């Protein structure tokens, strides 16, 4: 899917993003994410341009070199997925004398922040700030820097100024505070639709401008939001959304495979990795992970969609309506 955003969408989003995070012309941004990704383009290019500041880019992310580069360039803040800061903290833990000389704020998107990671970063003088959003609804929820230590991963944040967020039930009604429902948002930052996909656009974006994220959350009396699940069958691997159903569809026809069900398995570095449960055609000769990868490679399926672990099972449990339990 290709999300369409206007110039005004992007400019509003980045102006409120930099303002609420207290960024100024004197700040130096480090961007390890690819510039063809929303994170890299919005925050690595547009934000520094609007501030009149500097951006430091790294062609291929290598944690030790990244730390040295940031120190040499006086980097003060960064924005990327959790694995980037996770890897750099591992380097700092392993090497005496190496530190973040100037980095003070690292914004993390793509997945909730574990409290233990926030505490590790704080020991090196860095605030980890959780950011929530998507390409369609650019970052629109954040933890204010002054609240990072206090909230310590308990909340995904509050909406940026000028952006509305609601939590609704299956019927589209707003739920009481503290009750779980689907997160929806609207504002000047919102995309205008998917390129050449009218039906998909209509499912995601209603006539009043609300975007239906498919993410589950709850909101407290102060308007703080906690993302705590997903309606959609999505695996968040290193900040990238991967469709579990797409992986199972790609595996259809693989030799020795009768059925499969893919889920995200917890991972300390990436948040989740791809785990596929496999029902073999012949229990005496189940396919291996290498067999499945070879099949996907032959079909030119992107490597990011390859199972990273498989589990052989007798059958996949389903509900009365045929949905995987």
Question: Model segments located where?
Answer:
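Conserved AMP-binding A3 loop
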Residues: 1-15
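Short beta-strand->loop structural element characteristic of the AMP-binding/adenylate-forming
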Residues: 2-4, 31, 53-60, 129
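Active-site glycine-centered loops adjacent to acidic/histidine catalytic or metal-binding residues
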Residues: 110, 133, 157, 172, ...
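Gly/Ser/Thr-rich phosphate-binding loop
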Residues: 50, 72-80, 89-151, 164
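Conserved ATP/PPi-binding loop(s) of AMP-dependent carboxylate-activating enzymes
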Residues: 158-162, 173-204, 240-242
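Conserved beta-loop-beta connector loops within the AMP-binding
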Residues: 166-184, 203, 221-222, 283-289, ...
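AMP-binding/adenylate-forming catalytic core of the ANL superfamily
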Residues: 70, 78, 187, 192-193, ...
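Conserved AMP-binding/adenylation subdomain of ANL enzymes
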Residues: 11-28, 36-77, 91
């Amino acid at each position: 899917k290709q999300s369409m955003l206007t110039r005004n969408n992007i400019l509003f989003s980045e102006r409120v993003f930099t303002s609420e995070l207290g960024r100024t012309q004197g700040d130096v941004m480090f961007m390890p994410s690819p510039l063809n990704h929303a994170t890299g383009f919005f925050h690595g290019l547009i934000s520094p341009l609007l501030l009149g500041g500097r951006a430091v880019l790294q062609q291929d992310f290598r944690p030790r070199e990244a730390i040295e580069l940031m120190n040499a360039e006086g980097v003060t803040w960064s924005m990327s997925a959790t694995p980037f800061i996770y890897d750099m903290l591992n380097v700092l833990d392993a090497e005496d004398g190496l530190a973040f000389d100037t980095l003070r704020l690292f914004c993390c998107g793509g997945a909730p922040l574990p409290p233990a990671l926030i505490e590790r970063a704080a020991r090196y003088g860095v605030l980890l700030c959780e950011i929530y959003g998507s390409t369609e609804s650019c970052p629109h929820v954040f933890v204010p820097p002054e609240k990072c230590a206090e909230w310590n991963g308990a909340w995904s944040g509050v909406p940026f100024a000028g952006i509305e967020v609601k939590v609704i039930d299956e019927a589209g009604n707003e739920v009481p505070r503290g009750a779980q429902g689907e997160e929806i948002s609207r504002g000047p930052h919102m995309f205008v639709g998917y390129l050449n996909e009218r039906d998909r656009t209509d499912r995601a974006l209603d006539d009043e401008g609300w975007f239906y994220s498919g993410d589950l959350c709850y909101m407290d009396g102060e308007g703080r939001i906690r993302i705590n699940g997903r309606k959609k069958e999505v695996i968040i691997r290193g900040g990238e959304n991967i469709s579990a159903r797409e992986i199972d569809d790609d595996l259809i026809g693989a030799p020795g495979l009768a059925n499969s069900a893919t889920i995200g398995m917890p991972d300390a570095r990436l948040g989740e990795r791809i785990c596929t449960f496999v029902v073999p055609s012949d229990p005496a000769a189940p396919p291996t992970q290498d067999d499945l990868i070879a099949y996907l490679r032959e079909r030119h399926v992107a490597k990011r969609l390859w199972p990273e672990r498989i589990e052989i099972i007798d059958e996949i449990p389903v509900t009365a309506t045929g949905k995987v339990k």
